[in-house]
Amino acid sequence: MRKGGIQDAEPVEPPQSSRKSGTWFAKRPSEMPERHVERAPVRQKINNVGLYKATLYSNIGSFFFGIAVGWSGTAERSVMEQHSYSFQPTELQWSGVCILLTLGAALWCLPMGLMVRLLGCRRTILIQLLPNFLGWFLTVFARSVPMLYAGRFFLGMCGGAHCVVVPIYNAEISTTKKRGAMGVVFEGACICGVIYSFAMSLFLELRIINFVNLGLLALGPLQILMPESPAYYVDHGNIPRAEDSLRFLRGQKYDTRREIDFLTRDPTESEREVRQGPLLGFKYKKVRRSLARSLAIALLQKLCGALIFIFYGLNMLDCLRIRREFGLILCLGLILGFLACFFLVDRLGRRPLLIFSSAGIVFVSIYLGLHFKVWMTMGLTVMSWIALFCIAIFVGCYTAGVGSLTWVLNAELLVRPMRPLGCSIVCAFNWLTAFFVICWFGSHGVKCQPYLFLLFAIIASLILLFSLIYIPETKKLSSAKIQQRLGGLINRPAVITFTSSSDSSNA
């Protein structure tokens, strides 16, 4: 309930001693807590202004990464025609410029899990300012193709790090009622960066745009204002700092005792084992199951095709014989898709959005495939506009579903002790898939081929089926309840033999 901008907090779930409670690791008889009388949870008011600020600060780097991704599509003509640099790359070298962004992201994702465990999300995000500055500095002052390669690789490194750290951070600082909306802001920040790159390319020369992008990095130090995750402070025994962080996120009048008690409860022997070495967590079936589902949805996200429109969207407009200025219609589709996801993810839930958006991609892709087949044989120019609006619907459905929710589910399906390592593996796999997709697309002239869209329809159908069968609904659920729902087919709850990890998002 809201009153005067204040929201009632969902009470923190106290540790349960019943065998029927949602659990993660098997509790042995010696680990069972003593029975005691539980008092009814007391609801208290939460001021979410601090949460919104922390989410905004943490996604500044995501916006920078969106600019770097959008630069790939908007700069091609200027670079290839030698208007912005003293050198002129070949088509193969330009494909390398696009590919190295994804390769840098894939390689830099892997050490992020260790950095998050040791340094925390806040310091890991701040460290990325260095590769971000190096990347744009080399891009702006490139004197050769290898310098441009290096700049794009550094920018990819920074983006890959944010793909790992920001979703983890947003999941740990958010309440269960706000976790979905705060999680999709990451994709929204990237989209804003892409749209910014496209809009700037319509009015300014690439050389000026590069200097403006370099100047935008002055916003990076604002990330110092974001608090560290309370869970990180608790794990390192700094309870006063954890309480300060919670007051920043929930309001100065917020009573932190219940949430701190939940985070500081005694771990089971198996939980202590995983905290000593995350690799030990993979011997548990539900951890492997969560990771497998996250990997599958990450693979399908990059195969679905929207990345092609971002990297080669302007080329597709040329293929349709439409002026590049009308690419703003595609930007409108991205914005509407993100807004739909942002406002509905915590109301409808994750699964309905995945299912409906994937179904929309299937139908639009089939139509586009047939449309391009008819258009190429009949040569009707007016049909190009129909294709443009259909592509806008395609990217809108993608953003409303698998494009945004992949990052949310990546953090939600994994229990907190396994998130740093698990998310780094999933994100590395995600961007490695993007690397191969761009390699394949760049070497084949299939920008307006009907069979390309029919392939996208098949992949979207797989996303639809996978969401129906294997993805549980995680809306407003604690980590323990999410693990409980990770059953077999149709996500039937399995026998409850696992105990929940500490999860600060249960507040």
Curated annotation (Swiss-Prot):
Subcellular location: Cell membrane; Perikaryon; Cell projection
Record topological domains on the Extracellular side: 75-95, 146-152, 205-207, 315-324, 373-374, 442-450
Disulfide bonds: none
GO cellular component terms given for this protein: cell projection; membrane; perikaryon; plasma membrane
Stored PROSITE patterns: MFS, SUGAR_TRANSPORT_2
Keyword set, alphabetical order: Cell membrane, Cell projection, Membrane, Sugar transport, Transmembrane, Transmembrane helix, Transport
Residue ranges, annotated region (Disordered): 1-26
A Pfam family it matches: Sugar_tr
Record field: transmembrane: 54-74, 96-116, 125-145, 153-173, 184-204, 208-228, 294-314, 325-345, 352-372, 375-395, 421-441, 451-471
Matching InterPro entries: MFS_dom (IPR020846), MFS_ERD6/Tret1-like (IPR044775), MFS_sugar_transport-like (IPR005828), MFS_trans_sf (IPR036259), MFS_Trehalose_Transporter (IPR050549), Sugar_transporter_CS (IPR005829)
Membrane topology: Multi-pass membrane protein
SUPFAM superfamilies per UniProt: MFS general substrate transporter
One GO MF term attached to the UniProt entry: D-glucose transmembrane transporter activity
Topological domains, Cytoplasmic: 1-53, 117-124, 174-183, 229-293, 346-351, 396-420, 472-507
Free-text note on domains in this protein's UniProt record: Transport is mediated via a series of conformation changes, switching between a conformation where the substrate-binding cavity is accessible from the outside, and a another conformation where it is accessible from the cytoplasm.
PANTHER family with a match to the protein in the record: GH07001P-RELATED, PTHR48021
Family in the record: Belongs to the major facilitator superfamily. Sugar transporter (TC 2.A.1.1) family. Glucose transporter subfamily.
Protein name: Glucose transporter type 3
Organism per entry: Drosophila melanogaster (Fruit fly)
Gene: Glut3
